[in-house]
């Protein structure tokens, strides 16, 4: 066991050949293995893009924005780190080129460089090394994932900085792991190592000799091929590992352990640690692969359905809900813009309906139709952030009779702004980092479904929004049966809603950011449980005829 007071050791994870190989999952899985050996692990993601953070980037370009407790908008890989380990991510666990340059330029403006010419080397690289050391926070191991692909011009300052780190901290305190692709060429009937050889060659030209290679492949790489890779890449044969495609991401730590990766890391770092205790990972994988209660279909009604990375934490939180109920969750992505054409047949095929967060008016009328279908057919419903607001608008129009009810985000002239801009957001013009972000308290009402699911009176959840329920309409909604089950105790802001007599729950926050495979979030566990009960009830009766609901202008 590494004792406190010893130097932090650094594992640098780079990627080559193609993007989206799974560096984030590999880094998270390594963190899980090392943590299960009794080591304290922290993570850092370095992103080469010039945006200060991903908060203003399109989900189609970047995927999900993961929000931390301290209100940072970060890369989705931080979600993997939190789900796979006990480490808590903060804004210091994700840096971009833009943020690094911003720090350096601010120092230059303050005159901290004493009249020197500010350059990429040493000033930018020194700043990168400083944030690496800060992220360690006294942990035994800091795993640093460098985004992008080796060879990208944007990555060069980060690669130069991590090259220097080995000389700053010593050979035994820095290890380089390189993730590459070993593709199987069907026409030739064999695996090809040349892409890996060229990727490592490019990395070595930068001055980094990888200590170990993770070779992504859809099949086991034979020993003789690993020896060939080792020979051409100047790596010890025992340091070439198959990063095998597996059915569940929660099987990746077990797969890498079977390859002996964590033992090799202990050897390279020259540390002693206990054998990893992976029984709970084995249990999770068994529950994912062999659910006793079968399959349940959850319909996700959104507009980013073509890119599942847009809802990464949400998708995983639903899987966790399935684990909690010993069921397999099958996700059905339903394009809300297509629902606006009037055909709701896709909604009939699912056991529960979820409307996730989002921004912008496109697809909102389809989401409202999804809410209406769930309410009228008593299909379990879960609305998150914008999903809660869609539920409020749907009920205002179709139950309270408030024609034209809407959110001020979508219609500034609406006669009934049941969703309004938060007081603290009025006058805010900048887009980046200015929303209500991070963890805030939510007081739960006694006797409600929310209180029963959480088993607590007060919870803290992560937020990312500018708009809120308009409390001027609260009495009308309560008279119509809506229960405001969660409220911010400081501002009186509505955090949770529900309807009695069915599983119809909405929350203004993002509970998916706090769910883990070993600790499924109670709202997702309860939602999947309700979906299973609805599935079982539907199987006992003949299917109802699908209704087509007309789409009107704003209602």
UniProtKB/Swiss-Prot annotation:
Positions with a binding annotation for Mg(2+): 77, 145
Binding of L-glutamine, residues: 358, 386-389, 409, 466
Enzyme Commission number(s) from the entry: 6.3.4.2
Pathway(s): Pyrimidine metabolism; CTP biosynthesis via de novo pathway; CTP from UDP: step 2/2
Keywords: ATP-binding, Glutamine amidotransferase, Ligase, Magnesium, Metal-binding, Nucleotide-binding, Pyrimidine biosynthesis
Residues noted as binding UTP in the record, renumbered to the chain: 19, 192-197, 228
CDD domains for this protein: CTPS_N, GATase1_CTP_Synthase
InterPro entries: Class_I_gatase-like, CTP_synthase, CTP_synthase_N, GATASE, GATase1_CTP_Synthase, P-loop_NTPase
Catalytic activity field: UTP + L-glutamine + ATP + H2O = CTP + L-glutamate + ADP + phosphate + 2 H(+); L-glutamine + H2O = L-glutamate + NH4(+); UTP + NH4(+) + ATP = CTP + ADP + phosphate + 2 H(+)
Active-site residues per Swiss-Prot or TrEMBL entry: 385 (nucleophile), 510, 512
Ranges where the record places region Disordered: 535-555
A Pfam match: GATase
Residue ranges, annotated region (Amidoligase domain): 1-271
Gene Ontology, cellular component aspect: cytosol
Binding-site positions, CTP: 19, 152-154, 192-197, 228
Domain of life according to the entry: Bacteria
Family (UniProt): Belongs to the CTP synthase family.
General function of this protein: Catalyzes the ATP-dependent amination of UTP to CTP with either L-glutamine or ammonia as the source of nitrogen. Regulates intracellular CTP levels through interactions with the four ribonucleotide triphosphates.
Miscellaneous note of the record: CTPSs have evolved a hybrid strategy for distinguishing between UTP and CTP. The overlapping regions of the product feedback inhibitory and substrate sites recognize a common feature in both compounds, the triphosphate moiety. To differentiate isosteric substrate and product pyrimidine rings, an additional pocket far from the expected kinase/ligase catalytic site, specifically recognizes the cytosine and ribose portions of the product inhibitor.
Subunit structure, as described in the record: Homotetramer.
NCBIfam families (alphabetical): PRK05380.1, PyrG
Protein name as annotated: CTP synthase
Biological source species: Anaeromyxobacter dehalogenans (strain 2CP-1 / ATCC BAA-258)
Gene that this polypeptide is encoded by: pyrG
